[in-house]
Amino acid sequence: QLLQYRFGNGRLKGQNMGNLFIAALTDIYGDFELAVEKLHDILRIKGKVVPVTSEDVTLCARLKNGKIIRGESKIPKAVSKMESPIEEVFLEPSGVQPLNSAVEAIMNADMIVLGPGSLYSSIIPNLLVGGISDAIRSAGGMKVIVCNVMTQAGETDDYTVVDYVDAIEKYLG
């Protein structure tokens, strides 16, 4: 819950605690992958979290009304305010490359679990990194989609399980 906490007010409004924690560790250690390792140590995380890329990217969404929203925390607010659903999400810059460790982890996994989580601002962005969708499709491990128990305002309003799965399949290819 702590790492998923999103600030509601002040200068940090809309920011995710986990992202800030990793950003601070990256600044301290000067290396994103090392920061993730340190996060594992600090929080005594069981298992291993492997980032898909170390590149600096911005998540963008094209809404059904044609407007483009840049920035993960701005997307749900814009969708709700404009009453226009997400048409597609993409990364800027395009052509983002994956970390070899991410592709290796996917290829060696017994099971690949997509979800639960924010569909358009957490799950699908990983699929936008070059080579990740290909690795998931070609990996021998079982693929499992775990849908959220409820919709998320500004991302999956009125979505059914079929809509959720269709969105993931669209980006998996």
What are these regions (language model features)?
Residues 158-173:
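C-terminal functional extensions of proteins
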Residues 128-137:
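Histidine-anchored nucleotide/phosphate-binding helix
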Residues 146-148:
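Generic beta-sheet signal
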Residues 119-121, 150-153:
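Short, catalytically relevant binding-site loops at active-site mouths
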Residues 119-129:
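Glycine/threonine-rich flexible loop motifs
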Residues 138-143:
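A short helix->loop->beta-strand "cap" motif at the edges of active sites that frequently abuts
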Residues 1-83:
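Electropositive, gly/pro-rich neighborhoods at or near active sites that engage anionic ligands
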Residues 59-116:
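Active-site gating loop/helix substructures
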